[in-house]
C-alpha cells in the first residue's frame, strides 16, 4: 500500500515504488495499490497474504490503516494499530511517557488565539512549534525569536488545529529501531540542518 491521503503522499509513492521493485526483484508475487479514501474497499478483494504498508503520515502511520487491516484479518508489516496511534500523536505519547516516569521535553498546546507572550512566559528561545500528528518533520519549526514564532504558528495552523510548543533540547540525535521487541543497534543521526527530518 502506498500513496494515501496525508501531506506525505508524494514521498509515500516514491518509497512504495522502491519497495515494490525490491519485492519483485526478490521473485515475490506483488500487487501495488495507490491507496486513497475511494479505493480502500478494494483491499479485501485483492485477497493478499500480507500487506506491506508504505504509507506515511495520517491514515498510514496513525493506526487507521492498521485497524482497518486488523478488522479484515489481513496481516501487515509494521506496528499494530494501537501503538501506531499512540506514537503518531505527540500529546498522547508524551502523556504515556510521563505516566511511566520517562522524561520528555515540556510542552503546551496552543491555538490560533494563544498569545505569544504566554508562550514566551513558559519557554525561552529557542523552542519548537509543531503539529501533534504529522510525520517527516512536517510543520516542525525551531524558533529563535518572536517573528519566527508567529510564522511557525501561522504555518502550523494551516495544516492542523492541534499544535504544540515544546522545549528545545540541544544535543546529539540517535535512533533505535525495534523489530519484534528486539532493539537494533543505536544509530547516530547527523542531519544536514538543525534537526533530522
Where are the regions that the model predicts?
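Short, glycine/acidic-enriched loop or turn micro-motifs at the edges of active sites
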Residues: 37, 109-112, 133, 170
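Structural detector of well-ordered beta-strand residues that form the stable sheet scaffold
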Residues: 77, 105, 128, 164-166, ...
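Phosphate-binding site of ATP-dependent enzymes
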Residues: 144-197
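Glycine-rich phosphate-binding loop of ATP-grasp-fold ATP-dependent ligases
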Residues: 12, 106-107, 127-154, 173
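Basic phosphate/pyrophosphate-binding loop/patch that engages nucleotide-derived ligands
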Residues: 96-104, 155-158
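ATP-binding N-terminal substructure of ATP-dependent carboxylate-amine bond-forming enzymes
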Residues: 1-88, 92, 99, 111-118
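ATP-grasp fold ATP-binding core
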Residues: 97-98, 122-138, 160-171
Amino acid at each position: 500500500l502506498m500513496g494515501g491521503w496525508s501531506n506525505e503522499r508524494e514521498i509515500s509513492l516514491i518509497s512504495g515504488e522502491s519497495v515494490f521493485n525490491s519485492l519483485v526483484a526478490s521473485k515475490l508475487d506483488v500487487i501495488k495499490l495507490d491507496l486513497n479514501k475511494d479505493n480502500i474497499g478494494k483491499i479485501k478483494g485483492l485477497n493478499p497474504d500480507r500487506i506491506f504498508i508504505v504509507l506515511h503520515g495520517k491514515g498510514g502511520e496513525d493506526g487507521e490503516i492498521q485497524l482497518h487491516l486488523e478488522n479484515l484479518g489481513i496481516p501487515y508489516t509494521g506496528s499494530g494499530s494501537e501503538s501506531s496511534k499512540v506514537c503518531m500523536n505527540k500529546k498522547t505519547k508524551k502523556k504515556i511517557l510521563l505516566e511511566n516516569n520517562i522524561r520528555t521535553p515540556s510542552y503546551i498546546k496552543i491555538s490560533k488565539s494563544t498569545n505569544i507572550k504566554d508562550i514566551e512566559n513558559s519557554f525561552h528561545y529557542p523552542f519548537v512549534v509543531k503539529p501533534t500528528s504529522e510525520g517527516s518533520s512536517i510543520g516542525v519549526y525551531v524558533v529563535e525569536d518572536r517573528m519566527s514564532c508567529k510564522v511557525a504558528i501561522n504555518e502550523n495552523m494551516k495544516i492542523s488545529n492541534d499544535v504544540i510548543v515544546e522545549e528545545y533540547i540541544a544535543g546529539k540525535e540517535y535512533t533505535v529501531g525495534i523489530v519484534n521487541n528486539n532493539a537494533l543497534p543505536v544509530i547516530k543521526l547527523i542531519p544536514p540542518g538543525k534537526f533530522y527530518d
